[in-house]
Amino acid sequence: MPTKFEFSFSKSHRPAGGVAVLLQAAGAKEAAGAAVADPESVLAKAAKIGKFTGKALSTLDVIAPHGSPADRIVLLGVGHAAGMGDHDWLKAGGAAAAKLRSAEKITVFLDAPGIEVTGKAAADFALGMEMNAYSFESYKTRKSDDEPKTTQKPVKVTIVTATVIAAKKAFGTAQAVGEGVFLARDLVNEPANVLGPVEFAARAKELEKLGVEVEILTEREMKKLGMGALLGVAQGSSRPPRLVVMQWKGGKAKDKSVAFIGKGVVFDTGGISIKPASGMEDMKGDMGGAAAVTGLMHVLAARKAAVNAIGIIGLVENMPDGSAQRPGDIVTSMSGQTIEVINTDAEGRLVLGDALWYCNDRFKPQLMIDLATLTGAIMVALSNHYAGLFSNDDRLAEQLLAAGLVTQERLWRMPLGKEYDKMIDSKFADMKNTGGRHGGSVTAAQFLKRFVKDTPWAHLDIAGTAMGSPTDELNQSWGSGFGVRLLDQLVRANYES
C-alpha cells in the first residue's frame, strides 16, 4: 500500500517513540533536534564511524541511543544549506520518506545550525515526502503471495520548526500542488480500458467541486464546429471523442485568460500505421499532456489562484478498425486548412491543431501553451531529462525556462523556422501531418504553429518526461505528472493579479 502521511507543525516536540529525522548541514558539528533526540551526544560518534558528513541527501540510520525518546534516528544531510532552494527542500523530504517506508510515527527536526528554514521550506519538505510516497496500486489485490491488501492508517508526521504559522499557511498551497500532481499521475497510470475519452471527461468534470467551470463537447458538437482533424483520429475507435473545456475565473473580469491545451490520446495504437507490439502498452500514457492540464487546473482552483485560466483537452482513441482514417486521406481542420494524412501515427498534432484553433477563436487568450507526448524524436534529441520547448514568443519562452529551473521540470528550447515549415508542405493539401524522419519534433511543432495565428504560444513536447522517466527522490511512479508544477510556477511568478 502507498504510504499516507498526516502532517502537523510544532515549535517544539518530544517524540514518544517512533522515528526522529534530524537534518544536518555539511560541515556542521550538530544536527537539528540533537538536544532532544540525543541528550547524551552519541550521534556525533556514530556519524564519524559511519562517515556521515552531511552531504546532500545522504543518510545515516541508527537505533536510538540510550536516553533518547525516539526508537530510531535518521540523520539526513542537506549539503551546503546556504544555497538550498525550493527544489532542494522537496528532494530532502523525498529522501527522508524513502527511508521511512515502515515507520508508524515520525518527528522531523528542521532547524539545525547553519540552516535557514522558512515556512515555505518546511511545507516543501512535507510535499517532498508525499511526492516520494506516491504509488499507483489501485489494481493490486495483494501485497505479496500470502499477505492480503489492507487499509493503511496515515503515518503521523510532526515537523518541528520555529516557522509554524508560515509553514501551516504554505502547506495549504503545497497540498494543492501535490493533489494536482497526483491527479495527473493517476490519469497517466490508469489502463486505457478503464480511462477512455468519456471516462477521462468525467474525471475532469469533478473539478466543478473546486469551482472550475467544465464543458464537455460531444462528437456531434465538434462536427458542427468543423473539427475534421481531431475527428479523423477518433473515427477508428468505437469510443466517442470528447473535447473538455475547463475555466477557472480567479482573476479580474477584465483580465485576459492564460490558456493550456493538452493532447489526450487515451490509447495510441498508431492507427493503420500501426506501432510495433513491443512497448505498445506504454501508449496508455499518450494522454500525458491532457493529464497535466487537468492537474494544473486542479492546483489553480484548489489554491484559489488570482488568475483567469482555461484548460482544454482533446480526448480521442487512435485505433485501426475498418472505419479508421488511412494514409493519403485529406481532412479539413476547424481553421479551414486541409491536411494530408501521411502517417496515422502522427495523430497528436491533428488533435492539438483543432484544439488550439478552437481555444484561440473562442477565448482570444493572452497566451497559449500546449503540452503533448508528441514525438519520439524529442527523446532522441533530449532523452528523458528535458522536455522540448518551442515558441513564437521569446518572453514566454524565457518565463517557461525560468519556471523549469525553479521546479527542475526542465525545458530545452528548440528551433522553429521557415526551412522546417517547407518540410510539411503537401502536393495535395495545405499541409501534411509529418515531415519525415529528420527534425521530427521540430516539424511537429511547426505544424502546430499554423494553428495559433499571432497569439504568444509555446509547445512543450513531453514525450520523454511524462512517463517512464528515471525515478528519483520526488517520483517513484511510471506516470510522473510532469508539467503541473512547472506551469503552476509560471502562473504564480508571472500572471497572477
From Swiss-Prot:
Pfam families: Peptidase_M17 (PF00883), Peptidase_M17_N (PF02789)
GO BP of this protein: proteolysis
Gene3D superfamilies the UniProt entry points to: Leucine Aminopeptidase, subunit E, domain 1, Zn peptidases
Cellular compartment(s): Cytoplasm
Catalysed reactions listed for this entry: Release of an N-terminal amino acid, Xaa-|-Yaa-, in which Xaa is preferably Leu, but may be other amino acids including Pro although not Arg or Lys, and Yaa may be Pro. Amino acid amides and methyl esters are also readily hydrolyzed, but rates on arylamides are exceedingly low; Release of an N-terminal amino acid, preferentially leucine, but not glutamic or aspartic acids
GO cellular component, as recorded: cytoplasm
Active site residues per record: 275, 349
Cofactor: binding comment: Binds 2 manganese ions per subunit.
Family matches, as HAMAP family: Cytosol_peptidase_M17
PANTHER family: CYTOSOL AMINOPEPTIDASE (PTHR11963:SF23), LEUCINE AMINOPEPTIDASE-RELATED (PTHR11963)
NCBIfam families, per the entry: PRK00913.1-2 (NF002073), PRK00913.1-4 (NF002074), PRK00913.2-2 (NF002075), PRK00913.2-4 (NF002077), PRK00913.3-5 (NF002083)
Name of the protein: Probable cytosol aminopeptidase
The gene coding this protein: pepA
